[in-house]
Amino acid sequence: MLRSLADLDVNQSSVNLRGVQRERMPPTEWRRKVGYLPAESRWWSETVGEHFPRVQADILSQLGFEGEVLTWQVERLSSGERQRLALARLLSNQPQVLLLDEPTANLDPVSTQRVERLVMDYLRRKQAACLWVTHATDQIERIASRIFYLDRHGLGQKMAT
């Protein structure tokens, strides 16, 4: 579903962003405005820095990284480091909508808190929207303003506490 919303999979859905239909926007513009973070991030170059056209040191710092991380070899990154850096890469593009698929699944509690704090701050500052997919019910209670769930009956909604 997230890939379809991000216009990465062929679909017949009708989606709009601030009143503009996806079909009326060039795909590259849509994908700049609607940022997707997959459960497993993709890395195609040898060093971390090659993946960051615009480096925002404050984002890296908030996720627990020093500037030297940009010189690191991608192959040496742990799954948690890859996930946090993929989030930094996504946020550096400043999308209006975040589609996050299990963004903290590979993270320790300290890194999870950092990610939650960074994303929530980003949403407030940019007045952005977020669809955050997770199985962590305690996390849902901490971050959600609205909760949707899928079960055998389909899509449901419950109030956030």
Regions found by a protein language model. Give the residues of each.
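Helix-to-loop junction immediately C-terminal to a conserved catalytic motif
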Residues: 5-6
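H-loop/switch region of ABC-family ATPase nucleotide-binding domains
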Residues: 133-135
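Hydrophobic anchor residue at the start of the ABC signature
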Residues: 87
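Conserved ABC ATPase signature
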Residues: 73-77, 81
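Helix N-cap at the start of a conserved alpha-helix in ABC-type nucleotide-binding domains
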Residues: 109-111
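Catalytic Walker B motif of ABC-type/P-loop ATPase nucleotide-binding domains
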Residues: 98-102
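ABC ATPase NBD Q-loop/coupling interface
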Residues: 14-29
